[in-house]
Amino acid sequence: MLIVSYCVVMTPVILSVDDEQDVTDLVRFHFGKAGYEVLTAASGREAIETIRCRRPDLVLLDLMLPDIDGFGVCEILRRTANTAAIPIVILSAWSTTDARHVGLELGALDYVTKPFRPEDLVVRVNRLLQWCPAPA
């Protein structure tokens, strides 16, 4: 009798939501090197549509977007049953305590200010994904 077991390794998927191409390129490069699949969206509406089509394991979310701002996207994701558990990390140039407080109150798990060290962000995301169960 031959017993074969399979181990399926899932590639973690993150969605980078930012209207600055340089930021999405930086995220794609560093997270790609770390073994992630990186989806991108340049607006709040595009982010919501992308998530409807393909649920990421985590969202990196800028606040200053051309249509729905990051706070609005965060609020929409948290109010929707099938997206409420997706971990969100805000990645923004807004470094005020008020912006950080609002983002965390709306359900983001972390708040990282730009400029940021990509290597540090990868480590933070790795840790969050270890602690948070994968979305169903």
List each language-model region with its residue ranges.
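Conserved acidic segment of CheY-like receiver
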Residues: 11-22, 27-31, 59
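Acidic catalytic/metal-coordinating carboxylates
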Residues: 43-46, 69-72, 107
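Active-site beta3 strand of CheY-like receiver
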Residues: 54-60, 65
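The feature encodes the CheY-like receiver
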Residues: 24, 66, 96, 114-115
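Active-site residues of response regulator receiver
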Residues: 18, 62, 92
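Short amphipathic alpha-helix used as the core "switch/output" element in two-component signaling
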Residues: 49, 71-84
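Alpha4 helix (beta4-alpha4-beta5 surface) of REC/receiver domains from two-component response regulators
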Residues: 28, 72, 95-112, 123
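C-terminal output helix
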Residues: 116-126
